[in-house]
From Swiss-Prot:
This is 1-deoxy-D-xylulose 5-phosphate reductoisomerase. Belongs to the DXR family. The lineage of its organism: Bacteria, Pseudomonadati, Pseudomonadota, Alphaproteobacteria, Hyphomicrobiales. GO terms for biological process: isopentenyl diphosphate biosynthetic process, methylerythritol 4-phosphate pathway involved in terpenoid biosynthetic process. NADPH binds at T25, G26, S27, I28, N53, N136, E138, G217. NCBIfam families: Dxr (TIGR00243). Keywords: Isoprene biosynthesis, Manganese, Metal-binding, NADP, Oxidoreductase. Its cofactor is Mg(2+); Mn(2+). 1-deoxy-D-xylulose 5-phosphate binds at K137, S163, E164, S188, H211, S224, N229, K230, E233. It holds the Pfam family DXP_redisom_C.
Amino acid sequence: MSPVPLKNAERAHSGVRTVSVLGATGSIGDSTMDLIRAEPERYRVEALTGNANVAGLAKLAKEFNARFVAVADPARLGELRAALAGTDVACGAGESAVIEAAARPADWVMAAISGAAGLKPALAAVDRGTTVALANKECLVCAGDFFMSRATAAGAQILPADSEHNALFQALASGNRHELTRVIITASGGPFRTWAAADIEQATLAQALKHPNWSMGQKITIDSASMMNKGLEVIEASYLFALSPDEIDVLVHPQSIVHGLVEFADRSVVAQLGAPDMRIPIAHCLGFPDRITGRAAKLDLAKIGQLTFEAPDFTRFPGLRLAYDALRTGNGATTVYNAANEVAVAAFIAQKIRFGAIARLVEDTLNSWVRAGNQAPLGSADDAIALDQQARNLAATLLPQIAAKAS
């Protein structure tokens, strides 16, 4: 009997790949640079950007011999120039410089600038028709239809760099669109997975920041505790893969080993597994369509012992329900959802509201915005940024009454 043949083609990208990393000094950027560092002969760094960490940015520029670096804070240009004195690295500062970095010729761009500030640079990379590894949620949550349309028009390849969407991307390759019945995004359940609703309502900041599996920044860790992050991922999946809300399910999986599953018409389910390490999905993006040597630990299922799953609780975690509501409302509602959540999380961190009030502020903001009748398709990055600011202002005006109800 002949064995089933495995693909044994030459690397699709056997030469040196030119790469740029937007947000190089953040956690995603750090993981990306770690992978590039492991195989320096395969990559040439074109451009790097950072927010305000000039020392870290200059260090990376020197290590990887970057051609251009940009710091987002325009007041740091002099500091950046001084740090790069004696090198051939060109530098700039401010939004225009970051956009310039994104638009420079590169085979592959990591778009990892957080917040709305990452939208225009990501679009600049997309407009070049290059391959963009996307780690900025605002591009999809705040401008999904517009962003994906621009990518299609430019012939850009969008690769999802977060673990769940990268898992779906890999699993979706096992079938055709018309054969798909649903995708399943997994969630750890966060630190409050087994807590009663009354206890979740009163949870402290310290408790919300104790994620059981992932090491992440403060904002995303709180989003995980409220399951707002999973709501955002549902929205992202809808735009990224052109899925309806009814084609996206969420499954709580405390071990965070299975990151995404895809069910096909024949009832086959294809899943992607891996340790909870962001270097795994980033490595997939960096090597795509090839596979590169990873830096994360190998998966030892025998050591893990068991994988468990449970349905999400939309009552204890209303933020997840609100994401589906926003998707079905459309016309900018997902932008409002995201902006209101950011205002709510900032208020919780500042101890202005209880943990349970995060979802209430998001829901009240969405309802108020819908009643005002301002829904309209977003036609540009400026439209998305303007709506984001409008929603933040609306959430801020509703915040005092939400805080008063909780006191």
